[in-house]
Structure formats: C-alpha cells, structure tokens
A protein has these predicted regions:
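Active-site metal-binding motif and surrounding structural segment of the metallo-beta-lactamase
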Residues: 27-74, 158-169
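Metal-dependent catalytic neighborhoods of phosphoester/phosphodiester hydrolases
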Residues: 52-60, 75-78, 206-215
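Core dinuclear metal-dependent hydrolase active-site scaffold
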Residues: 1-36, 87-164, 229-239
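Binuclear metal-ion centers of metallo-dependent hydrolases, dominated by the metallo-beta-lactamase
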Residues: 5-10, 84-98, 181-239
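Glycine/small-residue-rich loop that forms an oxyanion/phosphate-binding "nest" at active or ligand-binding sites
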Residues: 64-96
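A short, acidic, amphipathic alpha-helical segment used as a generic capping/interface helix at domain edges
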Residues: 152-158, 177-186
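Active-site environment of divalent metal-dependent phosphoester hydrolases
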Residues: 28-30, 46-51, 70-74, 96-99, ...
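Structural motif
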Residues: 22, 42, 64, 127-130, ...
Length: 239
C-alpha cells in the first residue's frame, strides 16, 4: 500500500512500506511521521515555494537537494546547519543516480527552471516528483524562448519514455491557461504513469477539471487534488 498527503502547492508526503519521502515542503502542516521508518527529504530547488530551512530540523536519514541550494560555509553558518546535518545532505544536479538507503535509488532529471526532478525507486515502486520541470509556455513570451523551452523539456524528459511510474506529481499550473496542459499531457503520453497527482496549482484546484475536459482519456490515471491536507491511499493494484 502507498499513501500520500498533499501538504500544499508542490509539497507531498509519500509513505511506502519501508521508507517515507517528503517532497518540496515549504507550506502546510506536516502529518505525524511513522516512528522507526527512515525519512528522505527532497528539495528540488531553492525557490521559496519549494524549499524552506525548517526541513533541516527534521530527523531525516538524508536530505536530497537540487544543486542550486548552495551548502556553502556562509550558508551553513547563516542557516545554523550543524556538521552532523550537513553530512546527511546530498547536492544533486541533473542526470545523477544515488542510493541514499539500501534498496532505494534516486535518479534526477534537469529542470527547465531551477534545480532537478526526482525519480525514486523503492519497495518495488517508482515515484516521480517533477519539481519545476515543466513545459513552461507563456502567452506573450518571445516565440524563440517558448520554442527553446519545448526543446529542452522534451530532451530532459526523454529518459522517462515508456518507463513505468507508479505515482507522478506533476505541475498543472493555471497561470499558463490552457498552455498549462502541455506539460502533464506530454508526461502522461511519454511515460507509463499509473497515477498522476497535480501540483503547483496555486489553490486553483478546479483547473484539473478543465484539464480533464480537454484530455478525458487521462481521467482514469488522474487523481484530483481538492484541498490542502488531503490524504490518498493507493492499493497495490492501483499503483
């Protein structure tokens, strides 16, 4: 059984049988953590809607951080980061693979914005958190910029082609209007995503309905998020 809690914006807590995964928590109440189960904390990049210093107060086995979150001596002093905590931090760029725990593999993809996306394999499941890796197509932006964004997005996500992903947390950003459908639609066509949790919606949870009205074929795999603090449980046959 896999459990997930939507903390807010792009923050999720995912519970697998043998490990707990915390992604991009910066807002919302963190549920009680399971005692005796190792915690891995992920921060995809430094933007304030994806990262906050309070994560370092958690009793985590490891902190996996996008490389743009600089653990320089100056930052460590400013953040009052102990040597013990700093030793558990892994700074990751795109296209890296690490094993922070026995039986757990973390792969990264470059982002089209800042930092990285995370692909975690553990307990026979694969969980993907995109961070800000998205097809950012902005109406009114320079056409060349938008074309370059499309090229980079498709190149960065190519390693996911045909790959089974049991649970994917993907940006579905209403600020882009219908252009916000581009990213998740491409992800869902590219990879074998079993369950998709929308994120980065800025509280506009009804935007998922608009996405599904445009792409009804994705309804069976899309799990709408409707409120902060919402819990989800996925049985083995569902993910």
């Amino acid at each position: 059984m896999t459990r997930a809690a939507f903390l807010d914006h792009s923050g999720f807590l995912v519970e697998l049988p043998e490990v707990t995964l915390l992604f991009d928590w910066w807002k919302g109440e963190l549920p009680a953590l399971r005692p005796g189960v190792p915690l891995l904390v992920f921060a995809s990049h430094r933007h304030e809607d994806h990262f906050k210093l309070e994560i370092f107060r958690l009793d985590a086995h490891a902190f996996l951080l996008g490389k743009d979150i600089k653990l320089s001596p100056r930052h460590r002093k400013k953040w009052e980061l102990s040597d013990e905590t700093a030793a558990t931090c892994l700074s990751l760029g795109g296209n890296e693979t690490v094993s922070p725990l026995p039986g757990v593999t973390v792969e990264t993809l470059p982002s089209t914005d800042e930092g990285v996306a995370f692909l975690v394999t553990a307990d026979g499941k694969t969980v993907f958190h995109a961070g800000d890796l998205n097809w950012w197509h902005w109406e009114g932006e320079d056409p060349g910029w938008n074309r370059n964004m499309e090229v980079n997005f498709k190149r960065y996500t190519e390693p996911l082609r045909g790959r089974r992903i049991d649970l994917a947390m993907l940006p579905l950003d209403p600020r882009l209007g219908e252009d916000g459908f581009r990213g998740p639609a491409y992800f869902l066509e590219l990879a074998d995503v079993r369950r998709f949790l929308p994120m980065h919606q800025w509280g506009d949870f009804g935007f998922t309905e608009k996405f599904l009205a445009r792409y009804p074929g994705f309804a069976a795999r899309t799990v709408p998020v409707s409120r902060v603090g919402q819990d989800f449980t996925f049985e083995e046959e569902e993910v």
